[in-house]
């Protein structure tokens, strides 16, 4: 399927699946907050396998111009995000649906953890009203991801979606690089909130300007000062 045709199909699917949305500019959905926050963190591509729990995120990514690469297996998506992060030095992003979508990505996330690769894994979950009640593909994702990530948490309010993505991205680049995981329930993604209550942190202001292992350009600066010193 061509990129343009895929984009159109995702857009129509998202529109058909979501509850009727307000067109007012003073409200924003959780899915669009995810996309805006990812864009602020420099993400221009997400790797995923399409799933119903995360369809709202695709809708936001299409509006924000973030490329959606839809693969055949979530392990592939996780490895692709890892490879993207290693080659670009930027935050890689893998988005999976609940249950087997998350578990299929575990090997790729574990590889990123041992390789100190900065990737953000966003996973879907059933609605909060159905959490841990045996709903479709409901599993303890955060518990499973905690040992192989630097940061793993659920997001339980739409207002905090962007804030939590910023926090997770910060952990990816703090100290030794590595992956973070966020679980976002379907109703949190689908809900609309006043835009004023959903603050999106400024991008990148929390990050160090040098690599944790020593940026060659910054090491050369004091070396040059020492060489030119008279005493």
Q: What residues fall within each predicted segment?
A:
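N-terminal alpha/beta PP-like core and its mobile active-site loop of ThDP/TPP-dependent enzymes
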Residues: 2-231
């Amino acid at each position: 399927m061509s990129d343009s045709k895929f984009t159109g199909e995702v857009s129509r699917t998202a529109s058909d699946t979501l509850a009727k949305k307000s067109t007012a500019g003073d409200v924003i959905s959780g899915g669009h907050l995810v996309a805006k926050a990812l864009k602020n963190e420099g993400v221009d591509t997400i790797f995923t396998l399409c799933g119903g729990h995360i369809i709202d995120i695709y809708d936001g990514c299409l509006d924000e111009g973030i490329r959606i690469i839809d693969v055949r297996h979530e392990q592939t998506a996780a490895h692709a995000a890892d490879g993207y992060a290693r080659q670009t030095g930027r935050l890689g992003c893998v988005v999976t649906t609940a249950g087997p979508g998350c578990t299929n990505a575990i090997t790729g996330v574990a590889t990123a953890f041992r390789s100190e690769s900065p990737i953000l894994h966003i996973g879907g979950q059933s609605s909060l009203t159905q959490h841990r009640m045996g709903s479709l593909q409901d599993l303890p994702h955060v518990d499973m991801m905690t040992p192989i990530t630097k940061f793993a948490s659920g997001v339980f309010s739409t207002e905090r979606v962007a804030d939590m993505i910023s926090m997770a991205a910060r952990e990816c680049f703090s100290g030794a690089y590595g992956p973070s995981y966020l679980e976002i329930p379907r109703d949190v993604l689908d809900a609309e909130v006043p835009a004023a209550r959903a603050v999106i942190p400024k991008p990148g202001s929390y990050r160090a300007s040098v690599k944790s292992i020593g940026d060659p350009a910054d090491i050369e600066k004091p070396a040059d000062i020492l060489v030119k010193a008279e005493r």
